[in-house]
Amino acid sequence: MKTLLLTLVVVTIVCLDFGYTIVCYKRHASDSQTTTCLSGICYKKITRGSSRPEMGCGCPQSSRGVKVDCCMRDKCNG
């Protein structure tokens, strides 16, 4: 019985992922995929004149002609 309880606790910890990571879209140029972000923050960066946004982990600063949206949920930068 103790072994079963211990197994359930381990499975729960693995499934809940207590590391506070989130999944973000990651895109540079034409390829798009997901990645696990340890920072817990995703971003979408849109540069004026560019047809596709850049996406990834973290939250870079915006600048003139560049709009950056940061968020903290799974796949929120899509």
Swiss-Prot record:
Range of residues in the leader sequence: 1-21
GO molecular function: toxin activity
Disulfide bonds: 24-42, 37-57, 59-70, 71-76
Pfam families xref list: Toxin_cobra-type
Keywords for this protein: Disulfide bond, Secreted, Signal, Toxin
Family annotation (InterPro entries): Snake_toxin-like_sf (IPR045860), Snake_toxin_con_site (IPR018354), Toxin_cobra-type (IPR054131)
Tissue: Expressed by the venom gland.
GO CC, alphabetical: extracellular region
Subcellular localization: Secreted
Keyword Secreted (UniProt): yes
Family to which this protein belongs: Belongs to the three-finger toxin family. Short-chain subfamily. Orphan group XII sub-subfamily.
Name by which UniProt lists this protein: Alpha-neurotoxin homolog 7
Source species of the chain: Micrurus corallinus
